Amino acid sequence: MKAVIFAYHDMGCQGVQAVLDAGYEIAAIFTHADNPAENTFFGSVSRLAAGLGIPVYAPDNVNHPIWVDRIAELAPDIIFSFYYRNLLSEEILHLAPAGAFNLHGSLLPAYRGRAPLNWVLVNGESETGVTLHRMVKRADAGEIVASQRVAIAQDDVALTLHHKLCQAARQLLNSILPTMKCGDIPSVPQRESDATYYGRRRPEDGLIDWHKPVSTVHNLVRAVAAPWPGAFSYNGSQKFTIWSSRICPDAQGALPGSVISVSPLRVACADGALEIITGQAGDGITVQGSQLAQTLGLVAGARLNRPPATSGKRRIRVLILGVNGFIGNHLTERLLNEENYEVYGMDIGSNAISRFLLHPRFHFVEGDISIHSEWIEYHVKKCDVVLPLVAIATPIEYTRNPLRVFELDFEENLRIIRYCVKYRKRVVFPSTSEVYGMCTDASFDEDKSNLIVGPVNKPRWIYSVSKQLLDRVIWAYGEKEGLRFTLFRPFNWMGPRLDSLNAARIGSSRAITQLILNLVEGTPIKLIDGGQQKRCFTDIRDGIEALFRIIVNEGDRCDGKIINIGNPDNEASIQELATLLLDSFDKHPLRCHFPPFAGFQVVESRSYYGKGYQDVAHRKPSIDNARRCLGWEPSIAMRDTVEETLDFFLRSVDVAERAS
């Protein structure tokens, strides 16, 4: 049986050798060039392949059509991936008749994603393992072929556990590969309800929070001990790294971060003390704890701290245009909850952000993006990340005012994008699920789904094509002029402060707000074309968390990416949404203040939106990019979102209005 292998690291070397020992023919091996900035303590797949006389390649993008064609020419019967760091395209996965199989360093479906070796130690697990699974489009989600458990000892650190996993992987492969070679490939579906996802870890994630339980701090030390970057803290401006530690249950009543003693060196945590066995000051040598205390000038009672502001990076400045809008005000709240963000915002009103106006890290100017261009250009230049959130985004306005939609949604935003290009600033741009239009795919894929819109005489599509054209312009600026960008596509986000009942009164609101207005005023709920259109409703808290992670941009994984942000599990028709809303309304404590329910009324879209409207039957996102780039998964049920949104609007109605 002929195999093509994708491999890197020690696990890659083990996998290559196991495949050879099982009698497979290896047509080629694909690996990575070592990164000079990375501590390459591990074995070299390229050197192993060269020594074995096997062709080896390290392309920058193995999914490029040129490489896909070359792999196809190799005619592999089977494909293996052993710790190869990039996802393989479906085109590659489908080249091998027997399938493509990946070795993952956890007991799937737990700990999907990045760095499972480190995460299991961070989380204090007592067991992990290795899993060989069939590769599918979603990372680490395919059927399980075989797995092997590995016990985690209390004294295990990252390197010792790494060696255990390599041994377990070799045993697993030695056992299963001969069976697979004969065509007998077990397949057990993963239980999605048990799946957990973890993202890439960065060196800065090793910063110790002494207010955590001592077991948490000790587990962090274990998880990132050498040759990983290490857990670290500060004494004043002096950084030091802890390479090994042990737990002492008694903190003697000391405050977290306080030095209890220097010989041995013990530091108080939330519920105990950490004894530092070995460590390193700055870029110095590794020494035992008491010598480290001497080097740092520590004495009993000293307080360790987070990096001082003078020695750390300045706060990240985020410019939000349209800051008073639904996404803008919720995002502002999330950013201000983090110490290292400063928010600059502009909008034509401030009712939704009034709670932030006195915040020292929030800077607001009331203005119009079509008028205050000088202020905008200055602040694009001044800030680090730009979010142009201003848009007309309600369907009835697409048919009422198509030219205004184009002028604001495309022309004004294009000017802002050009400022970002001019000053080389990162832009996080709100595309929209509307760009998919009448796409017929079961779920909409950012990188593969076609964007399909209706005829020119249906102005309903002006919003979709304005956004799509900006997406394409931004992409081109990224390709040709190095613009750093991320496009995010929200799918029907809902929650408090979505818009207003007054907007619903003039027909310029989202669907749920219009439905709530009908309940508040005792008018029939209008179901456009019967309300059979399906959407995937997403809680604003889930959406904002994903957007926040895009801004954080861990490992620059979001650069140049398009990311759907929606909840595929919350798919419902507008009729089902209305029924759920009515049920929540009837159970609400304020129900008695409002008129009786006036029933449902089916209306044609033409009579409601005008002749220029055209609807979409379904709109369901693929969120593989969000899982992969953000380590994000939506978690809030649709009923919870509906109840919170309803509660917000009902409590916003004043007493006199309720009585009337």
UniProtKB/Swiss-Prot annotation:
Homohexamer, formed by a dimer of trimers. Residues 314-660 are annotated as: Dehydrogenase ArnADH. The record marks D140 as: Raises pKa of active site His. Keywords: Antibiotic resistance, Lipid A biosynthesis, Lipid biosynthesis, Lipid metabolism, Lipopolysaccharide biosynthesis, Multifunctional enzyme, NAD, Oxidoreductase, Transferase. Residues 1-304 are annotated as: Formyltransferase ArnAFT. Pathway: Nucleotide-sugar biosynthesis; UDP-4-deoxy-4-formamido-beta-L-arabinose biosynthesis; UDP-4-deoxy-4-formamido-beta-L-arabinose from UDP-alpha-D-glucuronate: step 1/3; Nucleotide-sugar biosynthesis; UDP-4-deoxy-4-formamido-beta-L-arabinose biosynthesis; UDP-4-deoxy-4-formamido-beta-L-arabinose from UDP-alpha-D-glucuronate: step 3/3; Bacterial outer membrane biogenesis; lipopolysaccharide biosynthesis. GO terms for molecular function: carboxy-lyase activity; UDP-4-amino-4-deoxy-L-arabinose formyltransferase activity; UDP-glucuronate dehydrogenase activity. Its EC number is 2.1.2.13, 1.1.1.305. The active site is at H104, E434, R619. NAD(+) binds at D347, D368, I369. In the N-terminal section; belongs to the Fmt family. UDP-L-Ara4N formyltransferase subfamily. It comes from Salmonella newport (strain SL254). The gene is arnA. SUPFAM superfamilies: FMT C-terminal domain-like (SSF50486), Formyltransferase (SSF53328), NAD(P)-binding Rossmann-fold domains (SSF51735). It catalyses: UDP-alpha-D-glucuronate + NAD(+) = UDP-beta-L-threo-pentopyranos-4-ulose + CO2 + NADH; UDP-4-amino-4-deoxy-beta-L-arabinose + (6R)-10-formyltetrahydrofolate = UDP-4-deoxy-4-formamido-beta-L-arabinose + (6S)-5,6,7,8-tetrahydrofolate + H(+). It holds the Pfam family Formyl_trans_C. Bifunctional enzyme that catalyzes the oxidative decarboxylation of UDP-glucuronic acid (UDP-GlcUA) to UDP-4-keto-arabinose (UDP-Ara4O) and the addition of a formyl group to UDP-4-amino-4-deoxy-L-arabinose (UDP-L-Ara4N) to form UDP-L-4-formamido-arabinose (UDP-L-Ara4FN). The modified arabinose is attached to lipid A and is required for resistance to polymyxin and cationic antimicrobial peptides. The record marks N102 as: Transition state stabilizer. UDP-alpha-D-glucuronate binds at residues 393, 398, 432-433, 460, 492, 526-535, 613. One of its GO terms (cellular component) is membrane. This is Bifunctional polymyxin resistance protein ArnA. (6R)-10-formyltetrahydrofolate binds at R114, V136, K137, R138, A139, D140. PANTHER family: BIFUNCTIONAL POLYMYXIN RESISTANCE PROTEIN ARNA, UDP-D-APIOSE_UDP-D-XYLOSE SYNTHASE 2. One of its GO terms (biological process) is lipid A biosynthetic process.
